[in-house]
Amino acid sequence: LIRRQRQMCIRDRCLDSWLYDDMQPFMHVEALDTYRFLREQVETGYFETLIEKYLLHNPHASVVVIEPERGLNAKREETLAEKLAAYKDSLSKEEIKQLIADTKHLKQYQEEPSPKEDLAKIPMLKREDMKREAAPLYNTMKKCGDTTVVHHEMFSNGIDYLRILFDIRDMEIKDLPYVGILKYILGYMDTERYGFSELANEINIHTGGISASCGVYPHVKKPEDMQFMFELRVKTLASELPQAMDLLREIIMTTKISDEKRLSEIIAQLRSRVEAAFDGSGHSVASMRALSYFSRAAYYQEATAGISFYELVADLDEHFNEKKDALIAQLEKMVQTIFVPERMIVSVVCEEADYQAVEAQIAFLLKNLYPSKEIVKERSLPELHLEKKNEGFMDASQVQYVARAGNYVRHGFSYHGALRILKVIMGYDYLWINVRVKGGAYGCMNSYMRNGDTYFVSYRDPNLKKTDEIYDGIPVSYTHLRAHETLSDL
C-alpha cells in the first residue's frame, strides 16, 4: 500500500508539469537540486526575506468576513420564485410551449444510451493487460517479548512506518464516543516536557507525523464479529526513530488531560471540524448511520466519528463547565486502561537492515506503558442492541444525501469478486443515469463489503423520495443482467 501511494504521488507530480509542457514530465520529481539549494539558504536569511517581502509587507491583501444570516435560504428561495414567476409572465404562449418541448427533448436525450461507436472510443484495458495473480503480501509475524509484531519488509527509502495498535474490543458501548474524543486530544495538549505548540514543533522536526485513530476490522465470514483498535501511527526517518518513539511515550504517558482551558478549546475546535466535515461528506455520514442500524462495525465507526459522536461533542461544548470534571476523569481512566502492554500489537514497514533498531524502540515503548490492572486471556465484545431507526437529519444545506443499507450475508449470500464488477456497472449505469443525469444529484455511490454490509447513497442530491424510489428499482433493472466483455455491450 505504501509503495502504491508513493507511486501515485509521483504520478500526480508528473502531471503538474506534463500538462503544460510535453517535454517536462519530471520537473517536480527531480527535486534534489532544489532541496540542496534550500538547505544552503537556511543560515543566509533567504527565508526571512521571502516572509518579509511576500507576506508581511505585501501590498496585495484582502480581509474577508463571513457572517451567518438566519433565514437566508428562505429569502433566496423566495427571490428565486419571484424571479421565475416574473420570467414566466414575460413569455408568450408560443415561448412557453417551446420551453416545454425543449425540456422534453432534454429528458429524451438524457435517457438515450450513448452509441456503441462513441463508447468504443474510450480507452480500455484488455483482459491480457491485467494480472490474474494477487499482489504479494510482505507479512512476517515476529515477537517482541509477548507482543506480536508484523514486519512488512520492503524498500522504504530509509523511512520507518509504525502502526501501534491497542485492542479495545472490550470497551463498553457507552464509552465509545469518548474514544473518539481521545484520538483528537493526544498530541494537541501540553505534556510533561512540552507545551502543545512546542510538542507540535518537536513532532515536525523528528517525524513525518504522529496521529491517533480508531480502527474497525470486521470479520469476513462473521458479520457480528470484529476487532476494534485504538491506533497510533508514526512515520519517521530511521535515524530519528528513537526521538520519535520518545515523543510517542511522552504523548501517551504524560498528556495533561486535566488542563481545562486547553481541553475546552479542543472540544470547541473539534465541534467546528466535525460540522465542516459533515458539510463536505454528508454521503459518508448518511451511509455510516444507515449501516449502524444492523452492523456492529458501522455502529462503532458511527459512535466514534458520526452523528452520535457529534451529539456528544456538541453537548460537551455547550455544557463544558458542568461536565468537564466527568470528562477529564473518563479520559484519564481510558488512557490508563488502553495503553497497557497486553493490548498492544505493532505493524512495521521498514527494510530488514533497520528492523533490529525498530524492535529495540518497540521494547522501549512497552517498558514505559501503564501496568495492567488485570490479566485477561481473551477480550470479548460487549452486548449490543442494534435498532433500525430509519431517520432523517436536517441542516442548513440545500441538498440531501439519501442512503439505504443492508447486509447480503445475513440473507444467505456470500461475497464474490463479481460484486466488484457490479459496483462499477451500477455506479456508471443505473445509478449514474437515474440519480445523477436525470435526478440532478452531484454523485451516487454503492458498495459491497466482504462482511456483507452494503449501501447505496447519493451525493448533493436535490431529491429525496425520488431517489429512494430509484433504489427500489435496482432489483428489477439487474434481474436479467448478462455479462459481456465491455460495458458498451450491455
Question: Where are the regions a protein language model picked out?
Answer:
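Histidine-acidic residue clusters that define the catalytic metal-binding segment
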Residues: S17-Y46, P136-M141, A290-R343
